[in-house]
């Protein structure tokens, strides 16, 4: 039976395609926009049945051109939180997603899609409930508005709808994202280029490098998607994070120590790395004051209640794996 992955050449989409391949699934239609042509590299080691541009996909899918489709993993979106073209963002992330959803509902196709923790904005609690949702940018609003649509249609839906609010995802196949790539990716490249990693200094009551995020490996993101694919009776909107808030210092020290280990050098504590100039703190930029989240942490209650009980990689585990993968790509 056919599977469809939108955003298939992107970061999370390509990892889902690869994870499906590892289970023997190759009847996959990859949908994307390759205007940024170098994204094709994310699919070079993947097996797919067909490729379609996003502009032709929805109409053909709604028309039934692909026969029986078991599931759509809808990962295609503009994920640039700095994008200021609201019309583009709403058309790409909201209108397009509604069209894919409508086609899935009409055909009884499982619909698993990418939501975002950006929906929570400046909230201090990260629970899948309306009172905690206050997006700070048009990207977050586009995701929020689509989740509101999902809440309205889910009670009457005859097929699965599962949305995942991704927290700070890092891992292989993100290099095309540029400035929107993960902190781990940028720390890796900065350390190789300059011999040190730079982090923000003290801000808003948090010490240097102590601002925290829920950093989640794309390995775990793919696993959660496939778990719900295997359990089509489970619908809902779910936070997809580790449930742990870890400081940027943890990312930096893990990147540095993994690269040191690859060169046969011993691990160092954070204090030792700072003392040796391997980690450096820079003044917090004025442009980000009042617009910066110093803390995110996924509430996993809904996810765990739905039956997902596997552990999540810590920053130390996941970033170590990722740095070794990046090093192997050099």
Curated annotation (Swiss-Prot):
InterPro entries: Epimerase_deHydtase, Heptose_epim, NAD(P)-bd_dom_sf. Substrate binds at residues 168, 179, 186, 200-203, 213, 292. Pathway: Nucleotide-sugar biosynthesis; ADP-L-glycero-beta-D-manno-heptose biosynthesis; ADP-L-glycero-beta-D-manno-heptose from D-glycero-beta-D-manno-heptose 7-phosphate: step 4/4. Its EC number is 5.1.3.20. It catalyses: ADP-D-glycero-beta-D-manno-heptose = ADP-L-glycero-beta-D-manno-heptose. Its cofactor is NADP(+). Belongs to the NAD(P)-dependent epimerase/dehydratase family. HldD subfamily. Homopentamer. This is ADP-L-glycero-D-manno-heptose-6-epimerase. The lineage of its organism: Bacteria, Pseudomonadati, Pseudomonadota, Betaproteobacteria, Burkholderiales. The gene is hldD.
């Amino acid at each position: 039976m056919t599977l469809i992955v939108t955003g298939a050449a992107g970061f999370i989409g390509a990892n889902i395609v690869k994870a499906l391949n590892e289970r023997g699934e190759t009847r996959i239609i990859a949908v994307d926009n390759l205007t940024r042509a170098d994204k094709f590299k994310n699919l070079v080691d993947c097996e797919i049945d067909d490729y379609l541009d996003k502009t032709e996909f929805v109409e053909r899918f709604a028309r039934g051109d692909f026969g029986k489709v078991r599931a759509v993993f809808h990962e295609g979106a503009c994920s640039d939180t700095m994008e200021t073209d609201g019309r583009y963002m709403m058309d790409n992330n909201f209108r397009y997603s509604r069209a894919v959803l409508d086609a899935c509902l009409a055909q009884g196709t499982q619909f698993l899609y990418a939501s975002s923790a950006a929906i929570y904005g400046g909230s201090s609690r990260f629970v899948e409930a309306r009172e905690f949702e206050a997006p700070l940018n048009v990207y977050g609003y586009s995701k929020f508005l689509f989740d509101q649509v999902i809440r309205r249609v889910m009670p009457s839906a005859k097929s699965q709808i599962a949305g995942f609010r991704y927290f700070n995802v890092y891992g292989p196949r993100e290099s095309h994202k540029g400035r929107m790539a993960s902190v781990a990716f940028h720390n890796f490249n900065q350390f190789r280029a300059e011999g040190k990693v730079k982090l923000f200094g003290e801000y808003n009551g948090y010490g240097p490098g102590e601002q925290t995020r829920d950093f989640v490996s794309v390995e775990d993101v793919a696993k959660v998607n496939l778990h719900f694919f295997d359990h089509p009776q489970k619908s809902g909107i779910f936070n997809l994070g580790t449930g742990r808030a870890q400081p940027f210092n943890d990312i930096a020290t893990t990147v540095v120590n993994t690269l040191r280990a690859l060169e046969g050098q011993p691990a160092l504590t954070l204090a030792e790395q700072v003392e040796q100039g391997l980690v450096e703190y820079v003044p917090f930029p004025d442009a980000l004051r009042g617009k910066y989240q110093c803390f995110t942490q996924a509430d996993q209650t809904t996810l765990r209640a739905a039956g997902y009980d596997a552990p999540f990689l810590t920053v130390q585990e996941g970033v170590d794996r990722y740095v070794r993968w990046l090093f192997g790509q050099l």
